[in-house]
Amino acid sequence: LLEIVFENEDGQTATLTEWKNTKGMYIKTDEDLQKRDNAQFGRVCQILDCFYPQRPDAELSTFKEMIDWTKKMLDPMVATKKKLRLKVIYDKKGYTQVSKLGIFVEDMSNTDSQIKLFKNDLMERPVVADKENNDPLNVPPTVTPETADAAGASDLPF
């Protein structure tokens, strides 16, 4: 797991999380896996490009090596507190996340932003109606039929 946390002056954070790609439901072939790994490495390189004028060379063959290399490259940069422009969107549940589509981070010194909005990017928190749950403790009173006593008369006067 690779987690990169971005923080603004107000202490608000946005997180980019990268997981190890494995074959499964959505990644069926070696080619698909390589494509996903390349896209993932491209996102990491976007962040590094904000701090380094020339992208450092690296021979990485595993996800763990990529994590270690990324940490080694970014740790000294945290202290610089360099200002970055970041594309933060909402997910379907209304939580903020760093977008993974296209260019999502760049140096604030760039006057012409290359960050673009795509049709799938949610920029407003989705409004989701609350589900009405039945409270198991709030049970309506049950009506019991009137029972007659042995004489056939009820306690009630009428």
Predicted regions: what they are:
Residues 1-158:
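Short beta-rich binding modules
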